[in-house]
Amino acid sequence: VGKINFYLSIISYFQLIAYFGIPTYAVSIGSGKRDNIKCFNRFADEVYTLSVLSTFISCSLLGVIVGRIHSFSDEWKIWVVLSVSIIFNTLGAEWLLQVYEDYFFMTLRYIFIQIAGVVLLFIFVRNSTDMTKYFIIYVIPCVLTGLSNRLYEKRYCRLKIRINKEIQFHLKALFPIF
């Protein structure tokens, strides 16, 4: 349990770097823009672009640290598996559903995916040597959440990478939140 918590605590720091305060910022600013579809789509694309960039930076830092610290590099497969959760949390853009207050979908999705995760744990994780299996099963709900969000969010807008000068404005606003 101690080793598992160690890995998860390290990953949580990189998740914070990837988030960069974006969910809080996106919900607070996006809620006021959601009625103007064109304006909101542009805003969502810009914030999503920042989210992808911060995730890239976070995963790159994780890769450098895992490569430099010998005890981390011995367990590189675990770090790769756990970094998938960072990537899919970004791709899922949960903040978009929060902007539109679609809590019913979020709740149902959460319940079904977590039940599936618990069932998988009971089926595949038998003892303390199954740590890699545990981490894979730990990441599966993140992947399913990200994919289901991505499919469901299309009813609100189609997120895409958009690089323009407005990103600098959002970046300045995000630093105090981060």
Feature annotation, model-predicted:
Residues 1-6, 33-45, 56-87, 127-135:
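Membrane-interface helix-capping segments at transmembrane helix termini in multi-pass transporters
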Residues 2-19, 143, 178:
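Alpha-helical transmembrane segments of polytopic membrane transporters and translocases
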Residues 6-9, 45-52, 80, 108-112, ...:
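Internal alpha-helical transmembrane segments of multi-pass membrane proteins, especially GPCRs
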Residues 9-12, 55, 86, 113-118, ...:
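Residue-level recognition of pore/gate-forming positions within transmembrane alpha-helices
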Residues 18-35:
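Helix-loop junctions and terminal segments of transmembrane helices
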Residues 76, 87-108:
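Membrane-interface junctions at transmembrane-helix termini in multi-pass inner-membrane proteins
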